[in-house]
Amino acid sequence: MVATPVKQKYDIKDISLAPQGRQRIEWAAREMPVLKQIRERFAQEKPFAGIRLVACCHVTTETANLAIALHAGGADSLLIASNPLSTQDDVAACLVADYGIPVYAIKGEDNETYHRHVQIALDHRPNIIIDDGSDVVATLVQERQHQLSDIIGTTEETTTGIVRLRAMFNDGVLTFPAMNVNDADTKHFYDNRYGTGQSTLDGIIRATNILLAGKTIVVAGYGWCGKGVAMRAKGMGADVIVTEISPVPAIEAAMDGFRVMPMAEAAHQGDIFITVTGNKHVIRPEHFAVMKDGAIVCNSGHFDIEIDLKSLKEQAKEVKEVRNFTEQYILPNGKSIIVIGEGRLVNLAAAEGHPSAVMDMSFANQALACEHLVKNKGQLEPGMHSIPVEVDQEIARLKLQAMGIAIDSLTPEQVEYINSWASGT
């Protein structure tokens, strides 16, 4: 089927920002040696020749390096933002001006613009979709079923997006393969834990200039992202409380040395609240009502639904911006609640997102997942697919090599031992 041509070539803030973006993209590339090796191979082999690809991602310097690698591999690609507040406008400008990649992303774009960009992405009639929260895939299956035959597959690297894809599959609407990048060892062990841990606190500090030492920080959720946030907050001198709904991670948090309690109790004690659950309304009106005056709330989960901001706005008698990306909600009782980044991803709304070195592995997974889909076109069943173990291991090997770290290999005796059942006590 012939693709419907996209009428606009791009929708960005200011193309004159390209030189600044180029400089920052090149700086990020210094910390992304694994993706660099993949890009160089793609440039020679052109695995995506003839493939139309849409990426819905945070438009950052790291994402730019992924987009450049896919472009080098021959992809006819288009990039849109996965979050209205996460776009780095100079990066978007550079991709358009220097690489000819159509980008539809403006920092601070409203929801109408965001959804229009999703529709423009689907007008590209993609064969491969790189999604970040599964908004493009969800729109495709709801509104563009006539395009399903174009799809080779999708990749997804967020916990939130994986939950949505599994729900789609259970409802019988996911009719093509989806690569679960999020659960790759070289993604969630590092991106979710070390990336989220560092960048979340970076966002809070940039937005507030607050001292974390001595503060009580409440971390909602103790998955890999929550573990990273709690670990880094503790390391900066905070007293950390963890809230959970699942007994297993709750025990883990307690054994890691954190206080664990329900949000209803933690709400009285916290100075700063960070949600990392991927679920809805983790912080609600009953929690706002008992928080300290000046309590800070923010989110590091994917969507802006973890904090019930609608209810907070309805309660507030006044809302005012007190710093960039930071709003003060003044309640009828005179107390105030501080919200960072409109309840969206604080690390991208108020900072630059994860460090390049950790995104190197995540985006290596994305690039190789796309290649896996193309190489196995028509052979993968609809539904969720894991990153092949050999791909995960190769990414880890390349990263170790780039870090100058050597490890041991099994001796022949050890290989024989682990493959034998005969040796006992």
Swiss-Prot record:
Family label: Belongs to the adenosylhomocysteinase family.
Residues bound to NAD(+): 158-160, 192, 221-226, 244, 279, 300-302, 347
GO molecular function, one term: adenosylhomocysteinase activity
Primary location class: cytoplasm
Compartments in which it is found: Cytoplasm
Record gene name: ahcY
An example Gene Ontology CC term for this record: cytosol
Gene3D superfamilies, per database record: Adenosylhomocysteinase-like, NAD(P)-binding Rossmann-like Domain
Keyword Hydrolase appears in the UniProt entry: yes
Protein purpose: May play a key role in the regulation of the intracellular concentration of adenosylhomocysteine.
Example GO biological process: L-homocysteine biosynthetic process
Keywords: Cytoplasm, Hydrolase, NAD, One-carbon metabolism
The protein's required cofactors: NAD(+)
Protein name (Swiss-Prot/TrEMBL): Adenosylhomocysteinase
Binding site for substrate: 60, 132, 157, 187, 191
EC number: 3.13.2.1
Reaction catalysis annotation: S-adenosyl-L-homocysteine + H2O = L-homocysteine + adenosine
Cofactor, free-text remark: Binds 1 NAD(+) per subunit.
